Amino acid sequence: MGKIIAITNQKGGVGKTTTSVNLGACLAYIGKRVLLVDIDPQGNATSGLGIEKADVEQCVYDILVDDADVIDIIKATTVENLDVIPATIQLAGAEIELVPTISREVRLKRALEAVKQNYDYIIIDCPPSLGLLTINALTASDSVVIPVQCEYYALEGLSQLLNTVRLVQKHLNTDLMIEGVLLTMLDARTNLGIQVIEEVKKYFRDKVYKTVIPRNVRLSEAPSHGKPIILYDPRSRGAEVYLDLAKEVAANG
């Protein structure tokens, strides 16, 4: 049975989608069967894997709102072993449409149960908010990876996220746990980055991954080419660190 991991932080611009795409691709690269679920209305994980959103006829919206069969929505990607459930801007209306729906928080969980046995890992790219889409992701997941940018105010807003995780644990998913905290966008030339690492480690202790994602030009270029870094530039520092992260995640089971 596949392990379901939500990549979430309600703060935007912390490397959430970059991590979802590249962790998923690197897990696939080391031989794991991976499904990436894009549950962010911006659909950046979808386009980051080379899928034209304009060509997507059905997406995760249809699963959440219309109970579409998840098997019909899954698309293969250019990465061997990596499939995706795409998102389009249509998803932006889903939170409002789900409000009157019975069991609205568990719709993604129910859908993924039908395909969980087909994958080693299911990675969910969450939107930068703590609304119903993120609640669906947390309810469906075994664990959470929290990307934290190595910048000033890095920990700002995390107490709200952790409180949401606790509420989901209490009411919807008692088994949900923090998988790990990932430090992203490190500029090793600055003292600030080092200070943030120390602060985050002090707060989260052994939950902080050994792998730290640096700022990397090739990593930021890859999405515009519709490729994860392992395909776009496999020899880059960005590919190297996400491969290290994939191995860390795989070692955790």
Swiss-Prot record:
InterPro entries per UniProt: AAA_dom, DNA_Partitioning_ATPase, P-loop_NTPase
SUPFAM superfamilies: P-loop containing nucleoside triphosphate hydrolases
UniProt superkingdom: Bacteria
Catalysis performed (reactions): ATP + H2O = ADP + phosphate + H(+)
EC top class named in words: hydrolase
Function: Acts as a spatially regulated molecular switch, capable of either inhibiting or activating the ability of DnaA to initiate DNA replication. Monomeric ADP-Soj inhibits oligomerization of DnaA on single-stranded (ss)- or double-stranded (ds)DNA, thus inhibiting DNA replication initiation; does not disassemble premade DnaA-DNA filaments. Decreases the residence time of DnaA on the chromosome at its binding sites (oriC, replication forks and (probably) promoter-binding sites). Soj forms nucleoprotein filaments in an ATP- and DNA-dependent manner.
UniProt protein name: Sporulation initiation inhibitor protein Soj
Organism: Bacillus subtilis (strain 168)
